[in-house]
């Protein structure tokens, strides 16, 4: 297809195309619409509604990630020193998300009641070694303004008052400890995605197409991409100056189709999940927190159990898990050939190397997949001793695709998220999983900063973003006073009183 001399008047041309209708694409769409309102862009989503795959309320493995209670974000190094850098980074990123929501809510643009509820976050451990670890973590983290309000207790009665289902039917002489942060949250990212896109759709320069899938993409000249898309069996071609690939696990397949040099070193490792869910009101009303345990030594990060209070479709539920498993699908609603189609000559050796190095992980995932209902409930009893199998049912969670990256040593399996950018800023892709949705605003700001839109107007656009997220605040994100000011502002707008 030849390029148009005046693409802005061409119905098949868009300044940007965002692939995927989940929290990542919707966050980027919101940012573009707010700071670049004249940009003509298209969002395409394979399913018939936004936020239905990885962003879906039951599909999202963890909500309200702020590193308050997730112990795998504060590991010990080889010398036994506690590392909290990742926890600090995640917490600051989550506060950035909170700041954007506060700005939009204050302006009357979104309704926080549809997606945000405050609820305590608790870390819970048993055994002297784990208690010592938790105490060390508490002491180190409370030195920082992000976690200054954290409480520690090894009192059975006090922990019982925080989370009664954790101590019911537990021997009172058992050595246990917990930390608690009252300013935790439960976020329904599916509902938030719908809020974002409802707002974005008011912009006359934005088009959203559901039941529309990316088939192929290629660079046709220095400034344009051609995308082949399919909607209910009908294929068409569109052109754009910028592409964002935010299609969850399928992003790796699309990134490979782009053939940008930066994509060559990547592969994907899919992980499935299942929840135990309780709807019984006499139990859901007794548990008002998110409680994270500690993974067994040598267990993978996705094995960390948590018992969450969640609000989904205006209903209060308890979710335990997710129990990880192995699959070759990259999305719940995709193909079992996803993994095999992602194997290319430039990543096959790194993927095989990861397979050999992580044989224990693969065996773990397979063993988790083979668990029956009773064995899953027995696992739940480690956190909730009074659990009764008849009160819980099983439901599939979403798919996660962990990053496999080529290294000098072969291949490396990464647990996290990573942005891949083309050298000219015309394409960006988001790979990976946790912490994901909770840090979407910070991640999408980075995506926007590396895009073609920042090439000629970086200073002005950066100011617009800062004014949107941090109005009346101007300082480094790493400055402790700035962090305190952000939390104070957000608490005031949301009506949260510590």
From Swiss-Prot:
Protein's name in the database: Probable malate:quinone oxidoreductase
Source superkingdom: Bacteria
Oxidoreductase listed as a keyword: yes
Gene: mqo
InterPro entries: FAD/NAD-bd_sf, MQO
Coiled-coil annotated spans: none
GO BP: tricarboxylic acid cycle
Species per Swiss-Prot/TrEMBL record: Prochlorococcus marinus (strain MIT 9301)
Essential cofactor(s): FAD
SUPFAM superfamilies reported in the protein's UniProt record: FAD/NAD(P)-binding domain
